[in-house]
Amino acid sequence: MTLANIKSAKKRAIQSEKRRQHNASQRSMMRTYIKKVYAAVAAGDKSVAEKAFVEMQKVVDRMASKGLIHANKAANHKANLSAQIKKLA
């Protein structure tokens, strides 16, 4: 299982692995929401893109507040996608 011999080190290894899996799942979910907005923009559907953007914004902000991604990365995602949605006629 782990290379750790000390009980506390074994526990930390188990907790780290559990946290890693949870974070990976959260990161994947966030990326999916972002991709939905990009797909709507690529299709040229402004109303769908705006709805997807609102959902994506909530998720990205939540991930930033929990420390999964940096706040600036969240801001960059929101700014870039918002600009692309505004370009749609």
Curated annotation (Swiss-Prot):
Keywords: Ribonucleoprotein, Ribosomal protein, RNA-binding, rRNA-binding. Pfam families: Ribosomal_S20p. One of its GO terms (molecular function) is small ribosomal subunit rRNA binding. Binds directly to 16S ribosomal RNA. HAMAP family: Ribosomal_bS20 (MF_00500). The lineage of its organism: Bacteria, Pseudomonadati, Pseudomonadota, Gammaproteobacteria, Pasteurellales. One of its GO terms (biological process) is translation. Belongs to the bacterial ribosomal protein bS20 family. Disulfide bonds: none annotated. The gene is rpsT. Signal peptide: none annotated. This is Small ribosomal subunit protein bS20. SUPFAM superfamilies: Ribosomal protein S20 (SSF46992). The keyword Ribonucleoprotein applies. It comes from the Bacteria. Residues 1-28 are annotated as: Disordered. GO terms for cellular component: cytosol; small ribosomal subunit. InterPro entries: Ribosomal_bS20, Ribosomal_bS20_sf.
